[in-house]
Amino acid sequence: MCSSDLSAAAGELAGWADHPAGRLGLILLLDQLPRNLHRGTPAAFAQDDKARALCLKGLSFGADRGLSPLARVFFYLPLEHAESREQQARSVALFEALAAEQAQGPARETFEGFADFARRHQVIIQHFGRFPHRNAILGRESTPEEVAFLRQPGSGF
């Protein structure tokens, strides 16, 4: 882990959350950075709860509304990564609303793609209650149905 990743995980950068851009920075450090630095290990998901809490708290007072549409995509990703049906529903609603806001703009297809990706995540959680592609990494036993799903092309992210 890099020093900013460790500092964010330890709560040392909590003051950043006082401003929308700082809150987004913390979300990126806790959600995206671990997924890329620690891909294939449990550490990739270790800060998900913290990132999700920052996202949800920010949503409660509209912190996302002060960000650009593309920045909001990253603000919402902790919900898309959640193994929770409720949070997946919220993710889809947010991404669909964002796509609707961009419906007349030049990035329409890009934002429709983000909404589609959120829906794909939601379908998996609705069916399994978790992301089967994380099972081996997190030491969870896969069900026969999950194993069959994982053998399908395009089943992972």
Describe the predicted segments one by one:
Residues 28, 74-78, 118:
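Short alpha-helical scaffolding segments that buttress acidic/His motifs in well-ordered protein cores
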Residues 2-3:
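Short, small-residue-biased leader/transition segments that mark boundaries at the very start
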Residues 7-19, 35-39:
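Conserved interaction-surface patches within small, structured recognition/assembly domains
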Residues 22-33:
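Amphipathic alpha-helical regulatory regions
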Residues 100-157:
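C-terminal accessory segment of soluble enzyme catalytic cores
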Residues 29, 36-66:
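Helix-adjacent hinge/juxtasegments
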Residues 52-103:
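A contiguous pocket-lining binding segment that forms or flanks enzyme active sites
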Residues 14-24, 63-70:
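Structural motif
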